[in-house]
Amino acid sequence: MPRVYIGRLSYQARERDVERFFKGYGKILEVDLKNGYGFVEFDDLRDADDAVYELNGKDLCGERVIVEHARGPRRDGSYGSGRSGYGYRRSGRDKYGPPTRTEYRLIVENLSSRCSWQDLKDYMRQAGEVTYADAHKGRKNEGVIEFVSYSDMKRALEKLDGTEVNGRKIRLVEDKPGSRRRRSYSRSRSHSRSRSRSRHSRKSRSRSGSSKSSHSKSRSRSRSGSRSRSKSRSRSQSRSRSKKEKSRSPSKEKSRSRSHSAGKSRSKSKDQAEEKIQNNDNVGKPKSRSPSRHKSKSKSRSRSQERRVEEEKRGSVSRGRSQEKSLRQSRSRSRSKGGSRSRSRSRSKSKDKRKGRKRSREESRSRSRSRSKSERSRKRGSKRDSKAGSSKKKKKEDTDRSQSRSPSRSVSKEREHAKSESSQREGRGESENAGTNQETRSRSRSNSKSKPNLPSESRSRSKSASKTRSRSKSRSRSASRSPSRSRSRSHSRS
């Protein structure tokens, strides 16, 4: 649309004053006022010609104004005029927008390496308005200049071709759409862009992949950690868990499968229980010295998923540990002390251990009757235990040990029966056995804390029979308080 330039405009002039000044010359589309000048855009070119012819040199707000046709094109494409479709670059105050690209492009060859795109653009402005300039981007010593109009491009080609810029004669070549030069230039530009993009994308992908893998690792660790925390609430269970994890570390595939299966639902808890039983068989073999104790351990660990039986489970684990500790102590005593007293002590302890094992077996049986699901998993675990050859060897060793100990244990049985007949009734004998069981447990715990006090306590216990009676009475009362132990005694009596 035709635009009219107003020069020497008064600073007090407003849009209403300009509209009133141009009233009667046709339809005005836009009034754009600047500091000291302005532009008026008309709908028709003839109206603009009339306004320029008649109003040039007239007074507006006390000032004689200059009214001319606007020479340059619109610099801001804000208003919806026809010229804004050409895509002119914003300049002046509003120059911070992106440069607009046009089809009127010149290739500048033999460009000095010291000449930047800013210098080239400033130099080319003498031919016309430049919208885009670039130097040494696609190729070295070569630049690109884009003009607003075809006439500007032709003027630059005529006037500036062969002129010197920084001591070098530049050669201007029109960049036609079908020319090889443009294709190669555009290709090289697109290649460089695509390469940089692919590099960035690869980097970002690798970063995201590594972050994802680290996330998944941390998630699997946190899952397994939360699992172990929820299951091992007692200290004894957490210790056994840490031992299991140490033994699992050489077999990476198993640990991976376990960490993956941690996120799954609890419907697969039976399979997990079977896997745990197998792992317990592999881990617990060097530590467990009797097959019955080994079975009770594996059963109590397979029950660790059921939170209702936590208290009973703690008792069974601590019993198994106290039995192991007392076995080791009794063996070390029987080896170090050749006297008959130490032998009789170890024999009486082994007898008490046997009874404790029987009770733990009866407890586990009575519990397994109420829980049919855990019984199936235990049966599978016991079948697999019987299949494993290493467990058979250890069972044989345990049976050989028990056979070698059997004559000495029978002698200790006869002695203890004679003592119990002479001193106590049958009911007190049972409470004494329960008391001695508890003594062995409490001593095994105190032994781990204070080892030097062991022999003195055990001697005083065996010498004074009246002290053991009073202890057994007091401990039988405390045993009757705990529900799990009273249940196990009632099962063993029946």
Curated annotation (Swiss-Prot):
UniProt biased composition (Basic and acidic residues): 247-256, 268-278, 303-327, 411-431
Chain segments carrying region Disordered: 72-95, 169-494
Record-annotated disulphide pairs: none
Major location (coarse): nucleus
One Pfam family cited in the UniProt record for this chain: RRM_1
PTM per Swiss-Prot/TrEMBL: Extensively phosphorylated on serine residues in the RS domain.
Modified sites of kind Phosphoserine: 78, 84, 288, 290, 292, 431, 446, 456, 458, 460
PROSITE patterns: RRM
Compositionally biased spans, kind Low complexity: 449-460
GO biological process terms held by the UniProt record: mRNA processing; mRNA splicing, via spliceosome; negative regulation of mRNA splicing, via spliceosome; response to insulin; RNA splicing; RNA splicing, via transesterification reactions
GO MF annotation list: RNA binding; sequence-specific mRNA binding
Subcellular location: Nucleus speckle
GO cellular component, one term: nuclear speck
Residue intervals passing through the bilayer: none
Domain RRM: residue ranges: 2-72, 104-177
Stretches with biased composition (Basic residues): 179-206, 214-246, 257-267, 286-302, 328-359, 367-382, 461-494
Keyword vocabulary terms for this entry: mRNA processing, mRNA splicing, Nucleus, Phosphoprotein, Repeat, Repressor, RNA-binding
Assembly with partners or alone: Found in a pre-mRNA splicing complex with SRSF4/SFRS4, SRSF5/SFRS5, SNRNP70, SNRPA1, SRRM1 and SRRM2. Interacts with PNN.
Family per similarity comment: Belongs to the splicing factor SR family.
Function (record text): Plays a role in alternative splice site selection during pre-mRNA splicing. Represses the splicing of MAPT/Tau exon 10.
Protein name, UniProt field: Serine/arginine-rich splicing factor 4
Biological source species: Homo sapiens (Human)
